[in-house]
């Protein structure tokens, strides 16, 4: 990948500003709309936020890690930055499309790169039904909530909730309960990425539920539908010696 125009996105903290000044001395940069690659300096959260902001431009993203985990990021190497981007591996992510309806009947639509989740709003456990492709698969789940995760997001909230890690090329989705109470032994399901999952929330007055698509939250939800979309592919760039697939495999062995 031959790159001449880069855009720089960063937090205005002391550490980021020092690195940005070094990068600006070495390379020319431009506005996001004119760039061939968007470089995000920070952590996974900053990268996800900016993907949501600029994914409509269909420009590849290259993350430089200044956060704590940096699962979706690359290590900092300012002197070889453009060469690393030139040699990088492209990973295509297909986000989830969430449609949520609240108690007033208003419908919200949002995209998620990691996961869509529903969760209880009070101390009362949530109660809901799960349909897959229009077929009822669980008549009632009592839990703190549930989530649907992409392969890229399977090592995040999904893993903490007890779900499996998925290889990027698996064309699967994780459906994982969050602290299931009944049925207690249900640990979730693996579904084809073509599946449509619907959550129908019960008794929302006594047991209110919120929904999230990554960091976007919606209150007092009565129904959520989740499906994968290939209409909005996201290109992430990773250093050739440390691809996202490598990271997912390493994570499964405690790395």
From Swiss-Prot:
E.C. designation(s): 2.7.1.23
Cofactor: a divalent metal cation
Reactions catalysed: NAD(+) + ATP = ADP + NADP(+) + H(+)
Record keywords, A-Z: ATP-binding, Cytoplasm, Kinase, NAD, NADP, Nucleotide-binding, Transferase
Cell location: Cytoplasm
Gene Ontology terms describing biological process: NAD metabolic process; NADP biosynthetic process
GO cellular component: cytoplasm
Keyword Cytoplasm annotated: yes
Annotated positions binding NAD(+): 44-45, 49, 114-115, 144, 152, 155-160, 216
Domain of life: Bacteria
Active site (UniProt): 44
One function term, GO molecular function aspect: metal ion binding
NADP recorded as keyword: yes
InterPro entries per UniProt: ATP-NAD_kinase_N (IPR017438), ATP-NAD_kinase_PpnK-typ_C (IPR017437), NAD/diacylglycerol_kinase_sf (IPR016064), NADK (IPR002504)
Family: Belongs to the NAD kinase family.
General function of this protein: Involved in the regulation of the intracellular balance of NAD and NADP, and is a key enzyme in the biosynthesis of NADP. Catalyzes specifically the phosphorylation on 2'-hydroxyl of the adenosine moiety of NAD to yield NADP.
Name the record gives this protein: NAD kinase
Gene name of the record: nadK
């Amino acid at each position: 990948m031959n790159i001449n125009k880069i855009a720089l996105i960063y937090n205005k903290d002391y550490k980021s500003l020092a690195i940005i000044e070094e990068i600006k001395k070495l390379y020319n940069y431009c506005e996001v709309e004119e760039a061939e690659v968007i470089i995000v300096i920070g952590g996974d959260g900053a990268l996800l936020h900016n993907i949501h902001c600029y994914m409509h431009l269909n420009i590849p993203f290259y993350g430089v890690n200044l956060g704590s985990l940096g699962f979706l990021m690359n290590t900092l190497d300012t002197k070889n930055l453009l060469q690393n981007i030139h040699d990088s591996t492209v990973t295509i992510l297909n986000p989830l499309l969430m449609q949520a309806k609240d108690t007033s009947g208003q419908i919200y639509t949002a995209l998620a790169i990691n996961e869509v989740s529903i969760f209880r709003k009070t101390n009362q456990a949530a109660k809901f039904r799960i349909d897959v492709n229009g077929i009822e698969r669980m008549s009632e789940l009592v839990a703190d909530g549930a989530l649907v995760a992409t392969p890229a997001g399977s090592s995040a909230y999904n893993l903490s909730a007890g779900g499996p890690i998925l290889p990027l090329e698996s064309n699967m989705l994780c459906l994982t309960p969050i602290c299931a109470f009944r049925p207690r032994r249900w640990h979730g399901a693996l579904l084809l990425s073509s599946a449509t999952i619907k959550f129908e929330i019960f008794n929302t007055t006594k047991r209110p539920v919120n929904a999230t698509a990554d960091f976007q939250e919606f209150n007092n939800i009565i129904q959520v539908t989740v499906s994968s979309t290939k209409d909005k592919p996201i290109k992430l760039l990773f250093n050739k010696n440390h691809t996202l697939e490598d990271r997912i495999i390493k994570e499964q062995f405690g790395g």
